[in-house]
Amino acid sequence: AKVLVNDLGGAVDGSGGTAGAAQKVVDEIRAAGGEALANAASVTDFAAVEAMVQQAIDAWGRVDVLVNNAGILRDKSFAKMSMDDFRLVVDVHLMGAAYCCKAVWPHMVAQQYGRIVMTTSSTGLYGNFGQSNYGAAKLAQVGLMQTLALEGAKHNIHVNALAPTAATRMTEGLMPQEVLDALKPEAVVPAMLVLAHESAPTRTILCAGAGTFEAAHITLTQGVHLGIGSEVPEQLAVRLAEVTNRAGEQVPQSGAAQGTNEVAKAMTAR
């Protein structure tokens, strides 16, 4: 393996920083017989991210896999959260992932090969009290993944997302110790390896933790055509259970599926 390890080495809230965190992982990789380089740049700095990617290109000539896993936490209920804390979490998780993707993208297009893994979260997929900033950023990564997978298809660039549950510095204060003991980080690794492999799927959201693996989907129900008119709001309220009924739901192949479904129903109702 040839791995460039990026870690700002800061606290969980993003403050501070040291190159020691990345170097520790590099030392472990080298001890196992791999090649590795350390990088302590902040993923919120696009110029630094471009330099990081160039560091890998200079060393090994190409970048085959990108795993976006940089993250911080600044948890508070939304009512008590400052917008500075909201923005910083979004900048690290979402813009950091976008910057890294943007920096590797031309290299992957040129070599007609790439595998990108976004680290999303159950908080982004389903919500979690006190994590509005984190949840917004993590679900935004899924939207980025969906579109990049479509745009990358013709270049053999597969883009997926992984929602891990693992005991890390970021989660150790959120769960009791017996739960943390069950959530060994290495239990998530198989999911990441599958998504980064040459035979990886694309536009897939895998969930992993404690040895269990699931898939998450964003679906679209069959829906109900009610037309246009002053009576529609009341009709929608009455038939909302029918609209939200999941029987026959689909996993759209792109965002166009929603509009296609709606226009088809309108044409049929004529």
List where the protein language model places each region.
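Active-site helix of classical SDR
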Residues: 101, 137
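Substrate-binding pocket helix/loop in short-chain dehydrogenase/reductase
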Residues: 29, 77-78, 85-87
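C-terminal helical subdomain
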Residues: 161, 179-269
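Active-site-adjacent segment of SDR/Rossmann-fold oxidoreductases
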Residues: 126, 142, 147-157, 198-200
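The beta1-alpha1 cofactor-binding region of Rossmann-like NAD(H)/NADP(H)-dependent oxidoreductases
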Residues: 19, 40-51, 83
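A glycine-rich helix->loop->beta "capping" turn
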Residues: 32-35, 55-68, 74-77, 113, ...
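Residue(s) in the substrate-gating loop at a strand-loop-helix junction
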Residues: 121
